[in-house]
From Swiss-Prot:
Pathway: Secondary metabolite biosynthesis. Belongs to the phosphatidylserine decarboxylase family. This is L-tryptophan decarboxylase. One of its GO terms (cellular component) is mitochondrion. L-tryptophan decarboxylase; part of the gene cluster that mediates the biosynthesis of psilocybin, a psychotropic tryptamine-derived natural product. The first step in the pathway is the decarboxylation of L-tryptophan to tryptamine by the decarboxylase psiD. 4-hydroxy-L-tryptophan is accepted as substrate by psiD as well. The cytochrome P450 monooxygenase psiH then converts tryptamine to 4-hydroxytryptamine. The kinase psiK catalyzes the 4-O-phosphorylation step by converting 4-hydroxytryptamine into norbaeocystin. GO terms for molecular function: L-tryptophan decarboxylase activity; phosphatidylserine decarboxylase activity. Keywords: Decarboxylase, Lyase. The pharmaceutical interesting psilocybin as a treatment option against depression and anxiety is being investigated in advanced clinical trials. Its EC number is 4.1.1.105. PANTHER family: PHOSPHATIDYLSERINE DECARBOXYLASE (PTHR10067), PHOSPHATIDYLSERINE DECARBOXYLASE FAMILY PROTEIN (AFU_ORTHOLOGUE AFUA_7G01730) (PTHR10067:SF9). Pfam families: PS_Dcarbxylase, PSDC. GO terms for biological process: phosphatidylethanolamine biosynthetic process; psilocybin biosynthetic process. It catalyses: L-tryptophan + H(+) = tryptamine + CO2.
Amino acid sequence: MQVIPACNSAAIRSLCPTPESFRNMGWLSVSDAVYSEFIGELATRASNRNYSNEFGLMQPIQEFKAFIESDPVVHQEFIDMFEGIQDSPRNYQELCNMFNDIFRKAPVYGDLGPPVYMIMAKLMNTRAGFSAFTRQRLNLHFKKLFDTWGLFLSSKDSRNVLVADQFDDRHCGWLNERALSAMVKHYNGRAFDEVFLCDKNAPYYGFNSYDDFFNRRFRNRDIDRPVVGGVNNTTLISAACESLSYNVSYDVQSLDTLVFKGETYSLKHLLNNDPFTPQFEHGSILQGFLNVTAYHRWHAPVNGTIVKIINVPGTYFAQAPSTIGDPIPDNDYDPPPYLKSLVYFSNIAARQIMFIEADNKEIGLIFLVFIGMTEISTCEATVSEGQHVNRGDDLGMFHFGGSSFALGLRKDCRAEIVEKFTEPGTVIRINEVVAALKA
């Protein structure tokens, strides 16, 4: 197993995947034509007078719209961010109508990408959008929107997408063979019902809701994602999430600027000014992002004790300032600006921070940051402070979509990051070794 130093000279190694990888991970539409078709159909439904009269705006969307109109600065920002945009949504009123359509449905499997991100992408890429989307009061309204959607996605009414139906030539239910194959792509040819706990003979495979399906459990972890090296080996650090490598950074600074072209972590911001922050200065961070079709639960990376769990309110649609105004390409050479912003996003987005004190003192205190991306805003821990965990134990889960995570090591930690994870586009399998003590 090749490893690299956990801390050498100041270094950031961006492993930003290609647009093709983001597309395969469910974060981009398959083509610009697919995006345009989605926007056109959504705009038609949202502007339909009969539809609007039948359903009306959901209460949190009414409150969101009222907040925009009650604050003169925010209102002007919501005017300015649409300037020059030719496609729908063309104004905040149409945006609210589109929300009203999206939040009444569960996502389907297909060629699109996260639906809210699809309608917000161009707005995020404006100065006015950045200014508005970093406002705390506005983000409280976004949280209300997503909490309301979450209630629906946790209800039995959301199961209508847990079917094998082909809805159109681009989209299908999550139990369609196309979707099932995508969800077990990295499981050595095993079938969905072999890998995950479900009953394929029951309606909806026995899942109680879309969220129940989304947070499916392994049928036998030791077959499909064994704890590599064994649970009793305390010299190893495992992957906490199933993901794709995005960034490795060394000599991470306590306080750093967040506007450089090269993405950078600022520990005080990332860790929400926690008193543990100084211990991680000049340490290292490994970050990955999750496939929309991936396993979305978290597993313990070490044998140790949960010291602290912190829920940090933050932003949902704030793109890195250095990328604002960059072209949104429709080619396979450059990712769109937002998807070049994941390190920045980890510093300011709504997230959960977990500190774990490893039993092995040569590893010591580590941190995990679980980051909700755009509409995927809910992170739920299933462990408590003071609880002891072993490598591979459940820690918690993301809700409702793809997300990102970061693992942080102290400068004095004697563990080193496994070299293969410093290569772009490397699949990180949960429970496999991502760092190990020096031999």
